[in-house]
Each structure stands twice: as C-alpha cells, then as structure tokens.
C-alpha cells in the first residue's frame, strides 16, 4: 500500500523543540505540506520512563496517521530512542515510512569526527535508551563516545526565553564533561538544543563540530519521497498546520521563536 502523494508529511514532538526540524524541512522541501503535532500537554518527554514514552509515541502516531500522511517524522530524540519501533509498527499498516532524528545525526558525527571522540548531549530518557551509543557503534569506527544527561536543559530552554545568565551557566555546567573528554564532535541530542548552539560553540571552542538533525532529516525525507514517487505534484509553496495537546496560546508564542516563521492555524486536540 502506497500513500497518496497529496497527503502531508506528519511530524511530532513533545512540544516546540521539533519546530527546529520543521524549519529545515520547510526550507528544504518548500512544495510539501506538513502537519505538526506538539504534545505539549505531556512535556517534557526527557524524564519519562520508556514505557510512558512508548505510550505517547503510539498515541501521537495513531492521531497523525488517522488524519492521513505520506511520511512520519519523529522529531523528538527521547521519543525516537524509546518508541521508534512502536511508531514503525503502526506506520507499516498504513504503508508509511518513519524517519527519526537519531540515525542521521550518528552517521554525520561519525563521518566528520577527526579524532573519533564524540559527545552526545541529551535528555535522561535518550541517554538511558542507549540509541545514540548503538547508532554510533554501528558505524564501525571504534568511536569513543561520551554521553551527558541533561535533565533540566530542555525545560530551561523552553521556559527561559529570552536567555539569561542562568541558562548560560546551565549550558556551561553540562559542557564540563565534554571538555574533559576532549570531544571534537558534539551531537545535540534534543531538538531544543539548537537554540543554545551559539553558547555551546563559544564554551567548547570553534574546533568542536556541532551536529543537529534538521538538515539530515530533511535530506532523508526527500530521498524517501523520491524513491517512492511521493513528492508533491505541485510546484508552489506548501502549507503547514499544527495540532497542540496543551495551551495553544503558549504554543504559538514559543513556537514562533523556534520555527522562525509565523505559525498559522493551530488546532487544540
């Protein structure tokens, strides 16, 4: 079963963090329509158990595919770490492929690291799930991986805008073990973290390469659409819509900063 090419690309995250991924997709795939679900009523995902995360992945996947989609992007690292297979099981029944944030980042990091010392800055749930370590080990380079669990970083980023000294101090704290390990490449293992990339770069130094998922995910999505002849048949500008399980006003206010574009229709669900 092949989905209709006129359907949107669906994407979900625990809130607004995944909008950093959507931003890259809107730029790279301008003719495509997108349907984004922000599960902000259940934010943050990063401190939830694997079982709770799988429940959210199942609920979000069923909601989005029930509305119709030709591709599903899990734009949340914690959700992908614990629930990617659950999403794929549901998506398979709809003939829909699933793209996650973890494998593309691991592939890029392994390819660009000169020393093989790679850092992963992520939520507790993502680190505990071990998905990044497995993905990096699968690259077959004998990489030296340093994982840093940052339980409060995503909430601080989401709630602390505009950023003050406390945000910088928090970022600096989580950089200490990365500097001690002399990593030359850092995976930003949460879609909130690109917003503090300038702080990370300043603290770690210009020689450390920062890896984010947005561009790689957009490239993977384009490859899948082309291979399955699912690209949009129109050449004009696609539409993007939003679903939100939490407060719509807060989602709009925060989301505009993350997406760096206006948010149009937001449906509370």
Language model segments and positions:
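Non-catalytic structural scaffold of enzyme domains
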Residues: 1-269
């Amino acid at each position: 079963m092949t989905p209709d090419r006129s359907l949107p690309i669906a994407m979900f995250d625990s809130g607004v963090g995944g909008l950093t991924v959507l931003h890259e997709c809107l730029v790279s795939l301008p003719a495509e329509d997108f349907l984004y679900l922000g599960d902000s009523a259940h934010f943050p995902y990063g401190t939830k158990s694997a079982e709770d995360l799988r429940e959210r992945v199942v609920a979000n996947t069923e909601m989005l595919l029930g509305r119709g989609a030709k591709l599903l992007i899990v734009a949340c690292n914690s959700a992908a770490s614990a629930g990617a297979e659950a999403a794929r099981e549901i998506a398979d029944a709809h003939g829909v492929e699933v793209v996650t944030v973890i494998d593309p980042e691991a592939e890029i990091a392994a390819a660009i690291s000169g020393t093989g010392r790679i850092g992963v800055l992520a939520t507790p749930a993502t680190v505990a799930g071990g998905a990044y370590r497995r993905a990096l080990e699968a690259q077959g380079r004998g990489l030296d991986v340093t994982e840093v669990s940052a339980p409060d970083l995503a909430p601080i980023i989401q709630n602390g805008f505009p950023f003050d000294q406390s945000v910088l101090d928090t970022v600096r704290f989580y950089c200490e073990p990365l500097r001690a390990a002399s990593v030359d490449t850092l995976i930003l293992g949460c879609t909130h973290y690109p917003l503090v990339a300038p702080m990370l770069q300043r603290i770690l130094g210009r020689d450390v390469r920062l890896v984010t998922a947005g561009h790689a995910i957009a490239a993977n999505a384009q490859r899948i659409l082309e291979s399955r002849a699912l690209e949009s048949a129109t050449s004009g500008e696609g539409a993007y819509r939003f679903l939100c399980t939490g407060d719509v006003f807060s989602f709009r206010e925060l989301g505009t900063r993350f997406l760096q574009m206006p948010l149009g229709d937001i449906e509370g669900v």
